[in-house]
UniProtKB/Swiss-Prot annotation:
MF GO annotations: rRNA binding; structural constituent of ribosome; tRNA binding
Gene Ontology process terms (BP): translation
Family affiliation: Belongs to the universal ribosomal protein uL16 family.
Assembly mode: Part of the 50S ribosomal subunit.
Keywords for the protein's UniProt record, in alphabetical order: Ribonucleoprotein, Ribosomal protein, RNA-binding, rRNA-binding, tRNA-binding
GO cellular component: cytosolic large ribosomal subunit
Protein name: Large ribosomal subunit protein uL16
Taxonomic source organism: Anaplasma marginale (strain St. Maries)
Primary role: Binds 23S rRNA and is also seen to make contacts with the A and possibly P site tRNAs.
NCBIfam families to which the protein is assigned, alphabetical: rplP_bact
Length: 138
């Protein structure tokens, strides 16, 4: 189950840059604890799915997991051994830009110790530094 949009207005996009802190999505909205990004990064749908599977295995079907990011930016790539020019390449993967301070995953309905361990394992699957946050702690 990869996280890609069903329909987009434009098929390809510019690369862009990730500047500044996140404007929204920096606090917990659903669960009692979560995983917050500390560095800017482009997360792929495969990385998000890998982290989600890691959390699900750690929790053993107890509690609930919310994914707070969605991949909506296409990344194009030209094939190997193709010369420059002749248009932009085809879509290789989908990514989302993550700014520092953004909550990536939330967990509810489990103990704090189990949630911390599950999110620690999930953060190992992600290409950036993350921190554990709780409802009372910021």
């Amino acid at each position: 189950m990869l996280f890609v949009p069903k329909k987009t207005k434009y098929s390809k996009s510019f690369k862009g840059r990730i500047k500044g802190q996140t404007k929204g999505g920096s606090e917990l909205a659903f669960g009692s604890c979560g995983l917050k990004a500390l560095e800017p990064c482009r997360l792929t749908s495969k990385q998000i799915e890998s982290a989600r599977r890691s959390i699900s295995r750690s929790l053993r079907r107890v509690g609930k997991v919310w994914i707070r990011v969605f991949c909506h930016l296409p990344v194009s790539k030209k094939p190997v051994d193709v010369r420059m020019g002749k248009g932009k390449g085809s879509i290789e993967m989908w990514v989302c830009r993550v700014q520092p301070g953004r909550v990536l995953f939330e967990i509810g309905g489990v103990s704090s110790v189990l949630a911390r361990e599950a999110l620690r394992k999930a953060s190992a699957k992600l290409p950036m530094r993350c921190s554990y946050i709780e409802d009372g702690l910021r």
